[in-house]
Amino acid sequence: MPTEAMENTVANLKESLLAVAGEEPILEIVIGDKEKWRFLNTDENPWPEYISKLLSWEEAKEIVDYDFDSGFGGTESHPIMAWTQTRVIFSVCYDGSEWLASAPRNPTDGITPQHYGGG
């Protein structure tokens, strides 16, 4: 099932990923770039070598282990895509409010599609 918006506006990206993955291990992840690195109070990307690269969970888990304000306003976390054996996890944003959702990794019968990100 897709994950709903987080009720608490403070979230941790690593914990959020693990919660959406549930019992399945995260296999790989791609971390997107940001114009502003607000959570680190800098405009400079501290990890340019990791952006848009396919990383193992072992490589990425420390990079995504940070708190951010997931509430309305401006986005603060990295946009991500992550893969488990059966799911694809991705970032969703509506008016600056951020959360993660997932979809089946392969075509699946009997699921109910929904809109993500507002609307």
Regions found by a protein language model. Give the residues of each.
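N-terminal domain-onset segments
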Residues: 1-69
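Short, compact, well-ordered microdomains
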Residues: 72-118
